[in-house]
Amino acid sequence: YNRIEKMRPFSTHGVAKMMHQLAHVSDAVAHPWYAKWNVHRFLRPEAFGGLVHLKKTGQRDYPLHDSIFDSNVLEKLLETSPHGTYLLSTITKIGSPTHPSYPSGHAHCAGACVTVLKVWLDPHGTRCWPGYIVEANGSGLKLQNFTGPEFEGEPIPNDEKENCLTVTGELNKLAHNVAMGRDFSGVHWRMDGVSGIRQGEEVAMNYIQNELDRQPECATRKFKSFDGEFVYLTKAGCSQDALDIM
């Protein structure tokens, strides 16, 4: 696949395989749902806020930690509440989903899909993001070139800087935004997203490993994990320096 100029992978190591893997690992949400219902049964922030409100107002005596009630955040909640409660607000009118909080299904799926993309698009973790990096302007209505301080005010070019923004780095941000964006709406805890991303990564690793073991040729997959460490996946019985398709 990588030694003959006029030959490119298709069904086994081509784009079709990448799309196939993305579709399959998207089903990773089955794993967090088992953990949500059968293991942790962890309260949503909104529901936990209900416990705090009932104890703070003397209606119940739940065994909640004293540090919660020593914090000034409760008074801030009371000041901003239109109904004079200590409940945690959510962005959505319907409130939190009715299934348990931990781990986040969105984060799980994001971690799995982003891991597959890193394996295919930036296995070495050093590929510069193609083209110029853009960001929102002050009003948030238009895009402008991003100029990091290390580039002395110049737009970041394609592949001309050693310290460019990498494909892996941007994909990590994508997974983080999907996971932590749920926190912004008030329906998840931070730990739901952090753990969900890592669990999704494990799902993708196991799936890719199973695929490698089923194919006839030796091949290696590698990527930089969310921890920043390189992970190597190799067909059983093959050396780590086996044919690197990427």
What are these model-predicted stretches?
Residues 1-246:
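Hydrophobic alpha-helical bundle signature of multipass membrane enzymes
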